Amino acid sequence: VLADGRPVTSSRENTYITNTTFGGGYSFTTAVQKGFENGVEFYFGYTNMEQRDVAAMTSAQHSSSYGYQPRGYGEIVPAARSSFMNEHKFVLALSYTTQIIGDNDTTFSLLGIRKSGEPHSITFGGDSFNGSGRDGYDLAYIPTGVNDPNVVFASADVANEVMAFVNSKGCISAYAGTIIPRNTCDNPWQGRIDLRITQEIKLGDNGHKLVGYFDIQNLYNLLSNSRGWAQEVNYNVSRAIDIDGADDSGRYLISGVDTDDSYFYSTANGQSMWQINFGLAYRF
């Protein structure tokens, strides 16, 4: 057992999977929608979500899902906020339909989305104490200060850098003197605006028509290179506090801090970049 009460477990022998009654949550959505005679349509929606789980199950095999589970007290793994939830999400849609070319419809549409970031965990960067065989998944012990009796800083500079990082984030400093629970911090908020312009051209009186469209996805990012980014944490784990194991008294040997560990700008599904698309469809 280490100085803060964390158990040190040996390498795993067998992995046993069973169901649990812990965890759960809710999702609440409200929306308003209105169309006007002048061709304007409006939609606004808000979703509030709270989901808790015991294991994120981020891998295809149970052994690696076990190993990639951030933990602080050995096999005691309480339910925590899910890695896949966004607590707040706002959706705003506006459209305007008019006739510019004869009696053919021209539609201008804007879609805006703003949502809070997914939760992530703060762990140690260094050798594992939890027996999973995978480094970087020990939930970090948060020092109370430069003289915390449960840690040994490599130098005064390291102590000051670590404490500056801890005190800069309320989601971390709130757990000073303890092992921080899983998924206490959040990724930054994300937002984007998409624009679509469609033009219909009727082909006779039989209902056939050509529909051309012009899309700008992530208009935010096109207008400003510093906007429209989706910043995430890889596998929802930030190995922010570096350690070189523990001494004979069970005190953590803290060697540094990496405030940006595992942060990246996601490009999945077109995030963090702008795109322009043209298209033509024939409808009949």
Regions found by a protein language model. Give the residues of each.
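Short, solvent-exposed micro-motifs at the edges of structured domains
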Residues: 1-284
